[in-house]
Amino acid sequence: MKLATYNLNGIRARLPRLLEWLAREQPDVVCLQELKCADESLPIADIESAGYGAVWHGQKGFNGVAVLAKGDTPELRRVGLPGDPDDTHSRYIEAQVQGVVVGSLYLPNGNPVGTEKFDYKLRWMERLCAHAAELLKEERPAVLCGDWNVVPEDRDVFSVRATQHDAVMQPEARQAWRRIVHQGWTDALRAFHPSDEKLYTFWDYTAGCWQRDLGFRLDHLLCSPEAADRLQGAGVDKWARGEEKASDHAPTWVALG
């Protein structure tokens, strides 16, 4: 099973790129983020024509997440992250595909630091930490994947000095990330590329970041022990970022046996 995560930065604007990537890479399961699209406006017919069933949690103009499965419709388990019934942001959806629990998440960016946006990010991460612990109790293959908006280590960004004030770099966010990982989750991409220094998944549109490879590793796939036992590979489809009118993120994937 090839399971991928892809922040589209607008599904309607990037639909040609999504369909091109699906046809070329043929992933079995896809977690999408930043649909920026209401439920009724999702181009589901195009997705189905590409051979994928889908469940989704949309929001007009912002956020939005989905899970796609090739030749099947994912079994929906949860819409929204537990812990705050007043949170209306469409940032989490969970489904089951071929016995694997898949969570597609779009973690809050948190900028600017020192505002309610950053506080919300940390609260959201605490809720995710609690939910991740509950998932592990099920003792089944599970993968939490998406745009985490966290740079885990200094080597996961092109320049610490240039980005030190960004919310994705803050110690509180990194500590929250580690609390989740230390529950027993495996950072699959780093596990297969332990020494890579430019293991990026995101390149900003501004200042020629893509052309100069000034990137961040923001998109992660965390595997439960039962999923980690089946890991066969992981990578980044970097070519997709270089296409015309591409998302600022590249698809990132794991292979499970």
Residue locations for each model-derived region?
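N-terminal, active-site-proximal structural segment of metallo-dependent hydrolase catalytic domains
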Residues: 1-49, 56, 63-65
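Active-site beta-strand/loop signature of hydrolases that rely on acidic residues for catalysis
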Residues: 6-7, 22-40, 102, 131-154, ...
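Metal-dependent phosphoesterases centered on the DNase I-like endonuclease/exonuclease/phosphatase
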Residues: 50, 124-218
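Conserved beta strand-loop-helix elements of the APE1-like EEP
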Residues: 61-76, 196, 209-230, 256
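Surface-exposed cleft-lining segments at the edges of enzyme active sites
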Residues: 82-83, 108-125, 161-166
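Surface polyanion/phosphate-binding segment centered on an Asp-His-Pro turn
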Residues: 235-257
